[in-house]
Amino acid sequence: MEINSNSSLWHSYNSGYNGNKPHPLSPKGDQVKVSITEDRHYKDVKQPVSPDYVAESFSEAMKNALTSVNDLQVEADELTQKMVFDPNSVDAHQVMIASEKARVALTFTKTIADGVVRAYRELTSLR
């Protein structure tokens, strides 16, 4: 969008500035080239890859999600037990990462379940 110097927007913008020159903060149309200086910067867009497995039904998708949450819980418990009985076999950060993954997954699952129950109650209480 280009601002015409004869427009009312231009005059209201420059009304407090005395002088014949344009306002010092007025847009000049300068373009800044952005270059990638680090590997973590945004690069070319890749097309999304289709998943290897797509659930056939909602119930199957929920079952798979709950199974993966359970697997995370089991993995965290196993690492915790290894840490207690053989501390040199596992690093403390591995135990913490597994425990946090399991906690976040369980919290998310509980939030989803609470939302479903709340929605069901609202639907059944409609009159």
Swiss-Prot record:
Question: One of this protein's GO BP terms?
Answer: bacterial-type flagellum-dependent cell motility
Tell me the GO molecular function terms: cytoskeletal motor activity; structural molecule activity
- Pfam families given for it? FliE (PF02049)
**Which keywords does UniProt give here?**
Bacterial flagellum
InterPro entries, alphabetized: FliE (IPR001624)
Kindly indicate where the leader peptide sits in this chain. none
**Gene Ontology cellular component annotations, sorted alphabetically:** bacterial-type flagellum basal body
From the Swiss-Prot or TrEMBL record, state where the protein is found.
Bacterial flagellum basal body
Report whether Protease shows up as a keyword of the record.
Answer: no
Record's keyword annotation contains Disulfide bond: no
Task: Tell me, in one coarse class, where this protein mainly resides.
Answer: other
Report the family membership: Belongs to the FliE family.
Query: Which NCBIfam families does this entry report, sorted A to Z?
Result: fliE, PRK12729.1
Quote the protein name from its UniProt record.
Answer: Flagellar hook-basal body complex protein FliE
UniProt organism field? Leptospira interrogans serogroup Icterohaemorrhagiae serovar Lai (strain 56601)
Tell me the gene name. Answer: fliE
